[in-house]
């Protein structure tokens, strides 16, 4: 989501391939190194007699084909035939399986193999214009509830196409608090359009407020601002307190400690409840672990952002699994979420 926040959220070993020097490779003067081939007589071409081959087989000396050095020249047609007869089947068994991409069903489970890696995909994926979710083992999961989140930075959406892609809900930014000492409350200029169009397309709706509250009073003001904009309109999903770093890393609340940030989140959520709505808190895994006390927020809906994984690493009601999805109905990249509560 292109709101005011940071998406931030070797020792490289250089391998030098050392080729073993071929004793028969041409030297700089054009002659062969250790040129013993010129000393061969016709009888030298036959290295082993059939009797010697049989003795070697009986003793196990030829058990490992890769360890043998048999001169398979045109003169040794018999040995070439014998070598292929002995070890040909083994070579066939060791041929790698052909690369595969696309959908595949194995033991009653459905997987999708990526075209670029030929490996099973995991996590949230958009494939041929439809959203899918694959668990950590690459198994496609059914009955998944997909949603997106949007703000003024996403415009020109075709909500009917978005719904057909598998999206059933949207979380819309209702507003934010500005920079500076004043910290004015601002309604997202695209909120009404997004809200109306999403409803008309039959999508369920929730909202979030990008907070920069530095104390509990400001957090309550933000919640009251959300209720004022909604003006009694019903929601299907919570009003989320969005806490994260500002885009310029110089936001009013960026320097808050864990205790103060947690108090702001609680004050916001309690005021949302007082206004008759369901409250929730949005943050990344890092923030839930380091910047805010998750244990004190578990009575509220938790919306966790964590990308490039097969699922949320913390318990939550909603998981934002990617910010780079591409789906029909929107020309750019967009956040996609999974709701675990329907």
Stretch-by-stretch model annotation:
Residues 142-154, 295-342:
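Functionally critical loop-and-helix segments that line ligand-binding/catalytic clefts
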Residues 14-94:
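N-terminal propeptides/leader regions of secreted preproproteins
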Residues 227-241, 245, 292-315:
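Structural recognition of alpha->loop->beta junctions
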């Amino acid at each position: 989501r292109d709101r005011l926040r940071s998406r931030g959220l070797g020792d490289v070993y250089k391998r030098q391939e050392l080729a073993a020097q071929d004793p028969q490779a041409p030297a700089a003067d054009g002659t062969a190194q250790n040129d013993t081939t010129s000393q061969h007589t016709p009888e030298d071409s036959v290295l082993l007699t059939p009797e010697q081959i049989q003795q070697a087989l009986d003793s196990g000396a030829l058990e490992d084909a890769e360890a043998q050095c048999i001169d398979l020249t045109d003169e040794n047609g018999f040995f070439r035939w014998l070598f292929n007869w002995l070890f040909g089947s083994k070579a066939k068994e060791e041929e790698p399986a052909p690369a595969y991409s696309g959908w595949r069903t194995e033991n009653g489970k459905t997987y999708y193999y990526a075209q670029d890696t030929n490996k099973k995909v995991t996590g949230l994926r958009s494939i041929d214009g439809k959203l899918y979710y694959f668990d950590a083992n690459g198994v496609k999961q059914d009955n998944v509830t997909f949603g997106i989140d949007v703000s003024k930075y996403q415009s020109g959406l075709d909500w009917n196409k978005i719904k057909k892609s598998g999206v059933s809900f949207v979380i819309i930014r209702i507003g934010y608090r500005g920079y500076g000492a004043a910290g004015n409350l601002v309604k997202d200029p695209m909120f009404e359009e997004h809200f109306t169009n999403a409803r008309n397309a039959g999508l369920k709706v929730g909202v979030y407020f990008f907070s920069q509250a530095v104390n509990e009073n400001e957090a309550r003001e933000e919640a009251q601002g959300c209720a004022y904009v909604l003006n009694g309109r019903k929601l299907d999903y919570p009003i989320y307190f969005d806490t994260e770093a500002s885009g310029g890393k110089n936001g009013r609340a960026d320097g808050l400690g864990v205790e103060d940030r947690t108090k702001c989140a609680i004050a916001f959520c309690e005021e949302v409840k007082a206004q008759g709505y369901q409250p929730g808190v949005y943050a990344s895994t890092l923030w839930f672990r380091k910047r805010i006390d998750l244990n004190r927020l578990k009575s509220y809906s938790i919306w966790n952002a964590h990308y490039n994984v097969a699922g949320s690493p913390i318990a939550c009601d909603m998981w934002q699994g990617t910010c780079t999805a591409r789906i029909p109905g929107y020309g750019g990249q967009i956040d996609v979420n999974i709701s675990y509560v329907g």
